[in-house]
Every structure is written in structure tokens, then in C-alpha cells.
Amino acid sequence: MENKKVALVTGGSRGIGKACAVELAKAGCDVIINYAGNEEAANKTVEELKALGSNSKAMKFDVSNQELVEAAIKEIMDEYKRIDVLVNNAGITRDGLFMRMSAQNWLDVINTNLNSAYFVTNPVSKIMIKQRSGAIVNMASISGIYGNAGQANYSTAKAGLIGFTKALAKELASRNIRVNAVAPGFIQTDMTKNLPQEQIVDKIPLKRLGEPEDIAKTVKFLALDTTYITGQVIGVDGGLVI
């Protein structure tokens, strides 16, 4: 039990984040999930993780608030003593044409999807440097690779995460810390349920939407299974970006 790896998954109560937490728990990690507001979903996820043998807990804090993040990381270290895996998954959408996009909708998405990666990764990377080991996986998107009309804020944030991933991978490699990103395509989650699925599926070579588990298995591979991959962005999109 003392050798179990400790993983922190932001936005881990539902959707892709929950699937990542479950996959890491199945692999033997003690998993801490962060959530923003849905306490019921978070508690349910923790129950599932504990049933898999994970010493899991849910922590409510705003990942875009540096002070709250640092307090949460300190609490994790006081209890778990280490952090081996970080999955920067927390994200929101505030879609709309750029001409009509409010400054608040722009800032909300940038703060939650991009700035949070700094606020969480900064203290966690210092812990990993002391451990001389660690794996960080950032949740990017195909929108950050080729852009998406109506998502200027989201595409900007995800493109920023890709640059962040590559730069940080170069900085931390000498400390045995790997940094990679996963770029999901259209995945069946609450964030995509209102999209015109038939039109989307027609553009996907595999002719279906992905499942959260498709992303989670890739995250688990990058976090735990490989030791010689860093600075990469792995597309999980059914062939949409070829």
C-alpha cells in the first residue's frame, strides 16, 4: 500500500475526468478528484473509486483561484505525502461567435481551462521535482489544434495548453518528470450532448463519437505505462484530424 502512486485529477467528478479517475484507480492509484460544484456527483465518484481499492477523496476548490489551489495541494501533501500523477482536466465552455462574446465569457474559459493549469501545476511540479519523478497529462482538444468557429475562447485556451505542455516537458525532463497532452475529438459527455451528432459523425472516419473511457485509457498510458514519451500531444478523435 505504501508504494501506491497518488494521482490528482481536476474536474474529476463527471465525464472524461471521472473516467480518468476510474482508470487510474483500476491501475492501483490513490486518486484525489477536484470538483467545482456538483457534490453529489463527486461523492458518487469517490464511492466508485474506493470500491476499486483506491484511498480516494473529493476536494471542492476553484482551480482558477491560486490561493485555494495552493491550500488544497498542501492538504493533499499533509495526507498523502506525495503526488505522482497530475491530470489537468478541469474545463468549461462558453461558446458563441467572437463578435458577440463578452469579456467575461472569454475570461471564464481562459481562467478555468488554461490559467488553472499554471495554478495547479506550479506547486505540483515543485513536489515532483523533489521526488525526482512524476507524470503530468494536460487535457487539450482538437479545437486547440485546428480551431473551431464559435469557440475562440476555448480554442485559444486549448492551444495554450499544447504550448504549455511542450515547454514544460523540456523544462522538467531532466528531473524525470514527463509532460504530455491528450487532444480529444468529439466525446459523448455533457459538453457535447447538444451538438448535431449526425453532422459530426459524418466527418469522423470511424463514424462514431468517442467514449470518455477512450480518453481515460490514453491518459493512463501516458501517466503510468510509458516512461519514454514526453512533450507529445496524442489525438484521440476517431481520425477526425488526419
Language model segments and positions:
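Active-site helix of classical SDR
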Residues: 121, 157, 165
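Residue(s) in the substrate-gating loop at a strand-loop-helix junction
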Residues: 141
